[in-house]
Amino acid sequence: MYQTTKIPRYRAIWNSIWMKKNPVTSNADTFHGFTVCDEWKEADGFKAWYDLNNVDDYELACDIYDKDNKHYSPSTALFVPPQLANLLRTRGAGFPIGVWKHGDDYHATYWFGQRHSLVDCTDEPRAWKAYGLHKLPQFRGKIADEPYNHIENQITLGIR
């Protein structure tokens, strides 16, 4: 009989950071360019930060303050609800979550028992702004005010 050892959560997260930094070939395009600060090059350095900042069931993101950031460090990383991290990602079709294109128009929709339309418009940023500002309030109180306000400002300005 094989015995499995459960890996501590901090170690699994630290390992995933390193998999992004040194991706296998199948993930190389997705994770190309990630870097890690010197402090986190050893698991013990990451664990010290993790112990102070971890939020159970949240995921570690380094691109909350800057959507193009690919550097993991204490000043760039933040634990956020997985739904918030997904909200700020582009889905496979190249559009942000909640935005889709039909003909020349962009649509912002959400699902609540059935599909609800927020806006139909001619440009993707406006559709994303409508969707982002609709979904973001569910995270107020689940993350600190500073990152929440920063994300809200980015969505309002069309940066996200």
Where do the model's predicted regions map?
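A short, exposed loop/beta-hairpin motif centered on an aromatic-Gly-Thr core
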Residues: 34-37, 114-125
